[in-house]
Amino acid sequence: MAKIQFSRGLDEEVIPEVRLTRSRTGDTGTATFIFTNPKILDQGTTEDITGMYLIDEEGEIITREVKGKFVNGRPEGVEAVYVMKSAQEWERFIRFMERYAQENDLGFSKS
């Protein structure tokens, strides 16, 4: 049931690239989601992007830091940043990502 939405009720089908950073103390972190040609930018979609909603059985994680990427005046992608300000937020985010990865056959690699 783990899913990502940019507009409530409209599930995003494009799987993002996710980049994680974490402080040395483990208290804070940042997740950057990069979507290439997401469904929300399709010509037929009239919904506004109101944020990025990470939804699973525990509830939802919300970020409003969402930006569109344009090439030659055409929408090409969406980049969203979620900032985790505590170890609890980090752990909650990781639980969501584990569910999302399992449902979408994704892997994790350290760089």
UniProtKB/Swiss-Prot annotation:
Localization, UniProt: Cellular thylakoid membrane
The protein's UniProt keywords, in alphabetical order, are: Membrane, Photosynthesis, Photosystem II, Thylakoid
The family assignment reads: Belongs to the Psb28 family.
What does UniProt give as GO cellular component?
photosystem II oxygen evolving complex; plasma membrane-derived thylakoid membrane
Protein species of origin: Trichormus variabilis (strain ATCC 29413 / PCC 7937) (Anabaena variabilis)
- Name the domain of life this protein comes from: Bacteria
GO biological process annotations for this chain's record?
photosynthesis
Q: What is this protein called?
A: Photosystem II reaction center Psb28 protein
Task: Provide an example Pfam family for this protein.
Answer: Psb28
Q: Does the keyword Thylakoid belong to this entry? A: yes
**Family matches, as HAMAP family:** PSII_Psb28 (MF_01370)
The membrane-topology field of this record reads:
Peripheral membrane protein
Assembly behavior:
Part of the photosystem II complex.
